[in-house]
Structures are given as C-alpha cells and as structure tokens.
Amino acid sequence: MRLFHFVSIVSLFTIMTMVSSVSAEEQYLEFLQGLRDKNYHDTALQYLDQIAADKATPKEIQELIPFERAMTLMMFSRTQTQPEEQEETLNLALAQLALFTKQYPNHPMAGTANTERGKIILEKAEVEGRKAQSPAEQNNKKAHQEAARKLVAQARDIFQKAYNLHEKTWKSFPATFIDKQKEPERYEARAKAEIQFMSAQLDLAQCTYAEAQTYDPGSADFNRLLKKAAEEYAKIHERYRSQVGGLYARMWQGKCFEEQGELGQALGIYNELLGHPGKSSAIKGLKDNCLQFRLICLNDEKKKDYQLVINEAEEWLKDNRSRSRTAIGQGITWELARAQEALANQESTKKGDQDRILRQALANARFVNAFRGKYRDVSRLMVGRINAKIQGNSGGDPQDFATAYGLGQDRNKQTKTLKDKLAAAKTPADKKKAQVELTQFMEETARILRIALKLADNKTDPKELDHARFLLSYTYYNLRRSYECAILAEFVAKSDDKVNGGMSLDAAYLALAGYLQAYNDSPK
C-alpha cells in the first residue's frame, strides 16, 4: 500500500502553519497545488521555472521555489511506474531540498524541509519495496528489503530529532488556558507547536508502518510491526481525537487492521470516520481516503460485497466529477472496476447483465489506465482480460481510419436516441438504467474515435481528421470529461482555421463550453 495520501496530507499541517495569509503568496501556491492535485506535475514544474524567471514574482515565493519544486518532484514520482525512474526523481527532489536549506538556512520553512527530506527517504524505501516485489528481482529480494529497512531507519532518525525538538517547544508552553483574544500571538505559537508535535508523532508511527512493508505480507515480522504501528496510531488518536491529525491516525490504525486481515475492525473504524460530522476540506479529504480503504475491504475475497462497492463508488464519482483524476479518484474508480469485473464473473449474475457490467468495468479500467502510476499495469491487464471475453462479439476493432471514422459518425448520431430514451424514463430505476446505457454507449464511441485518430496517416483527409477530433471532443463534453473536451476542441479551433474555417468557430464554442462545464463541476 502506497503511503502518499497520508504523507501529502500530514505535510500540510506544518506548511499551513508557516504560510502567512498574504494574498499574493496564496495565489501562487494555490495555483501550483491545483496543478499538482490534477497530476499535471510536468506543467507544475514548468510553472515554477516560469515564475522563477519572472522578476515580478514576490521575494517570498522566489525563496520557496526550490522547496516547492522538491514537493512537486516527490508527487511526480508517485505517478511513475518504473522503480528506477522513481528513484531518480526522488533524488532530484532531495537535491532541491538541499539547495533550499543551503540558500535559506534561516528560512521559517527550513525545519519543514528537513522533515520533508525524511518523507522522501520513506518514499525511496517504498521504491526498494517495489523492486523486491518484482519477479525479475527475486534473486535480490532480500537485499532490496534490507535496503528499504535502512532507508526507513534513516527517516526515523530525522523524525526522532524533529520529535525531540517539537516536544521541547510544546512543553515550554504552560498547560493553562491562553485567551486567543487577549494573547493572540502566544495562542497561535502554542497552536503551531502542538501541530508540529502531533505531526512528528504521526511521522514516527508512519515509519513503523513503512518498516512492516519491508517484510513479506503475513510473515511474523510483518504482523508484529503492523500491530505496533496500530498501537502507536491509537495513542495519537486518543490524545488528539478532536483534531484532524488524530483522525488520520485513527484511519491508519484501521489500515493496519485491514492489512492483518481483521476486516471487521478496519471497517468499523472507516465507518466511524465516514460518519464524522465535519465539513471542512481536511475532513472531506479524510473521508475520501476512508471510502477508498472501505471499498478495498468490501472487494476482499472474505467480503465479496461487489454491488455495494459499485453503488458507493458510483455515488462518489457522481458527486466528485472534478476529482476523478486525482489519486483518490483513480483509486475509487479502480475499486469500482474491480467490483464490476468480479460481479460480472459471478455465476449468479444473469448472462444478459454480464456483458453490460463487463463493458462498464472495461470503461473504468481504461480511464484509470490513461494515468501514470500504481494502477496502470493492473488496469492494462484487466483491459486485456475483459477484451478477450467481449471482443469476439463485435468482430474486432476497425483496422483503418475510414472505417473507424464512419463508425464514430454513426454512433454520434445514435446518441440522440439514447438521450431521448433517458429523458422519457419515468421511474428512478428506469432513469438509472437509461443513464448507464447512454454513458456506456458514449464511452465506446469515444474509444472508436480514438482508434480513428491513431489510424490516421499522411494520406488522411485533414478535414475528416479534424472532424473526428471534433466528434471526440463533443463526446467528451457529453461524458462531462470537460478538460479533455476543452483542450481537444481548442486544438481543432486553432488548427482547423487553415483547413476548414467553418468548423473552427464551432470548435471554439465547444472549448468554451468545456471550460464552463469544468468550472461548474468544480468544488464550490
């Protein structure tokens, strides 16, 4: 299990206490974080290069650029599939942190940078763990596991020093009440010290969890360390149960139970946290993590509660369209695909429903497979499995542009019939069935049009090629894949003017509609 959801969120505790409420600074960092949340890490790195070269960039932001570049590289590494590439990216991140602390040793974020160094080292330990799991590295498995343990020990040493420092700072404040109105600076200082002390405790507990991952699942050392980590998380939760950090500790206590096979205890904790009344963005992020972990439990062989996974995952994706591309969104979509494939393969599923459910699983697996990261390989295998079952029914995919383009045009015309069917549906059950049918049909239309674009060559009519792009963009719009719609339509609007000016205006309108839809679907 990757650590990044926890690592990223816990990192925010200290950062939030250090960044002042200067609007200009918030503007730069908020935009940067938005790019990273969407997994546009290459664009985020380009943005950092751009503002680094811009003389108008505030001094406070200029100083933070090496630090933010390191954070971006660390997040980027989580989307890479090859351990060697991940290791190289993480080393670049460490170099940027070293540059930051060298250039600005007295910067308020210098301490945070050192803590983040420990977290990057933990990420490197996970990379070694991935190497140990590789079939090609089985002869070196023990060596990779030992290397991972050494890296965890290095990270623990960094976190222990931070713990000692933050504990001392925290204990320097009296345990008595501090009036926020009368002593605002003192109140804020103690609150900041408490957050840093809590984060240090979480980091140490995370080291114990990470060390468990360096042993084979189910082994005595694996279970021993997971039990120890669960106890450490429990103590943190007991101390900070009313704070976000304490709630995250509770969630990771549940994760430790889950990985020991104690699904009942894990689900009890996840359900408890999902029922938390909080509405803040931090609590929402916590609940999203808990939902993903809950779906993993429900998909387990011991539970096989596939229909419940489908219901809960589809509900989350419907309510969080703009977040489907995030790490959490990809994880939830992957659990949805797993549940759909498993449900379709159950003997109790009617044959008439099997093909429909398999095609839904196929669409979700393809969506996840479009992103770099931990789900790419497993989703590729799923796509292959499902295709092997349903490919023969359709006679295979088109083998030339003209056939694929013509099929895409025909399917685009048929979409209206399915939309009318949805509009005419009376009962909620009929509406849901019609919506599923429409979505599935449009996903297949998009796939056919993508095949057409891949089959295009230098003999393809430029007008037909741009029209195929336009149809694909329009299909994306109907699927509410707004970013894909806007980017592709904007490309057509700019390129088609030289070929067929009549389509460029329509494409420009479609691009604007895509951006507007993306804005309307974004969290308010």
Region annotations inferred by a language model:
Residues 1-6:
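Positively charged n-region of N-terminal signal peptides that target proteins for export
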